[in-house]
């Protein structure tokens, strides 16, 4: 095990704030579980990540690259659906691997990720590269559940061509230490990328979330939307960046991070960042964190709800629009897991 630094800000601030990056006790994953594909028609083994894939750190990226590599190519004018399941097992508790996705012109893919397992002290390190050619469309639903006392390193990089669209929705509900590093490059004009994440962190869970989208093509559009709840002694840090590069005139970007702290022992840090070298653009950022409004809780309790039920209603009202963006096949599972994790009557 070694100490590394992960998720470094693209434009650093004062060192005494201790938010430019995060320290992490990192251990390379061991015996690897298998990735199971629901459909192997477009899947082949092997592949190489691009040289400019950074990842959360050099160490975490190297760990993913030491595992198995897979390449998924969706041909031109093809619509496909694919589910990738990775389950920690007793004899193979860890996972390391790389995934390269290429959607050719006018291709469409509905992709579902499932990471799960009851095995304690697992370590997952993944690196995924998504390349979307002209007018390609990719919808991703990413679900993590279970994996108690485990470390999860999710790293991804997306490059979008003209009029390409990427909608990435993740439910960060598993693991004890979750590190997400997502970088998007809107290289094509009229390209669109939406990064949505919901979470329900409980116990000693720690979330380190990094999202960065570069606007390069003209009239590109980006959204970063993160919402969730923290209970017990959970903590979360959000680093979100929208970078408007010279030449991306007419582009629009919005980012927001919203956290409900159900306990005074929780900790939340939010760093929404806007960078710009182009005049004709629109960029907005926002963050909100705090405990529940007791007037709202009182109102719900006067209508017959218990304190626990009232708290869950407020949290669900915040994250339900994000859940509805997930693939329909996983929505009820996500909602049930959120309720289970935040139900204080079970603790």
Give short role names for the model-derived ranges.
Residues 1-28, 85, 120, 143, ...:
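A generic "cationic amphipathic patch" detector
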Residues 1-70, 89:
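Long, low-complexity, mixed-charge
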Residues 21-23, 33, 44, 49, ...:
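Residue-level detector of solvent-exposed, low-hydrophobicity positions
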Residues 55-298, 302-305, 327-347:
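Conserved beta-strand/loop scaffold segments within soluble protein domains that form the structured core
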Residues 297-320:
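Extended amphipathic alpha-helical segments enriched in small hydrophobics
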Residues 318-328:
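Short arginine-rich
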